[in-house]
């Protein structure tokens, strides 16, 4: 394949969203483990409701919307705005576990990118702990991934990670997990459109169930996941 092939950015995106990416995503459930323990998520239907509810009311209006602005800031070489957005997103996590998950995955990806020779990841201020969307946006810009495709990839990776956790926790069969992912394709596209069209004063939303599930998970007696 020619090095300038237009397919290369998409192939890099596929690698970025792959579950084999060494960022530790398999260790986290984002409160889903408590939701299963509490009987809120018990089957395929309730799992889909939980995952897609958070996609619409939390990830799209916070992570996705800020990620969209991060990409724009990087393309303008506006490092100050990029750092401001990273701080904003990091400060928006509603529990210590959610913040720790985001920072650990973000720093893992940033470190990986640095080792792969991505200069922007290397130059990210040492005192500035990268959120995962920030590190993802650096990767997307480096490999010339179209911003809207990068946003789709980020939203897809969030949903897929939740489904993989649900397969272990509920438990769901793998076929049920695939049914949820197939049904989620159109929902992800709507989340992408919502994230990229929000005004600044519309960014952010309260997801009480996520916040409480994550906080309760911190003292849950028996746990498979870190969040």
UniProtKB/Swiss-Prot annotation:
Main location: cytoplasm
GO cellular component: a single term: cytoplasm
Keywords noted in UniProt: Chaperone, Cytoplasm, Nickel insertion
Keyword Electron transport: no
GO molecular function: nickel cation binding
Gene3D superfamilies: Urease accessory protein UreF (1.10.4190.10)
InterPro entries: UreF, UreF_sf
UniProt key word Hydrolase: no
Subcellular location: Cytoplasm
Top-level taxonomic group: Bacteria
PANTHER family with a match to the protein in the record: UREASE ACCESSORY PROTEIN F
Family: Belongs to the UreF family.
Subunit structure: UreD, UreF and UreG form a complex that acts as a GTP-hydrolysis-dependent molecular chaperone, activating the urease apoprotein by helping to assemble the nickel containing metallocenter of UreC. The UreE protein probably delivers the nickel.
The protein's role, per its UniProt record: Required for maturation of urease via the functional incorporation of the urease nickel metallocenter.
Protein name in UniProt: Urease accessory protein UreF 2
Organism, as annotated: Brucella anthropi (strain ATCC 49188 / DSM 6882 / CCUG 24695 / JCM 21032 / LMG 3331 / NBRC 15819 / NCTC 12168 / Alc 37)
């Amino acid at each position: 394949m020619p090095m300038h092939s237009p397919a290369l950015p998409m192939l890099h995106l596929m690698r970025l969203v792959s579950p084999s990416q060494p960022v530790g995503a398999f260790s986290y459930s984002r409160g889903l483990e408590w939701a299963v323990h509490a009987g809120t998520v018990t089957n395929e239907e309730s799992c889909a409701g939980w995952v897609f509810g958070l996609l619409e009311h939390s990830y799209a209006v916070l992570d996705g919307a800020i990620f969209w602005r991060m990409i724009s800031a990087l393309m303008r070489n506006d490092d100050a705005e990029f750092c401001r957005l990273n701080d904003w997103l990091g400060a928006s996590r509603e529990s210590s576990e959610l913040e720790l998950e985001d920072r650990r995955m973000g720093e893992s990806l940033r470190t990986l990118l640095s080792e792969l020779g991505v200069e922007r990841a290397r130059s990210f201020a040492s005192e500035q702990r990268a959120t995962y969307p920030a590190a993802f946006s650096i990767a997307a810009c480096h490999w010339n991934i179209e911003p809207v495709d990068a946003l789709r990839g980020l939203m897809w990776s969030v949903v897929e990670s939740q489904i993989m956790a649900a397969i272990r926790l509920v438990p769901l069969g793998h076929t049920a997990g695939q049914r949820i992912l197939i049904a989620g394709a159109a929902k992800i596209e709507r989340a992408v459109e919502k994230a990229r069209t929000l005004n600044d004063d519309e960014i952010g939303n309260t997801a009480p169930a996520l916040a409480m599930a994550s906080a309760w998970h911190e003292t849950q007696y028996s746990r498979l996941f870190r969040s």
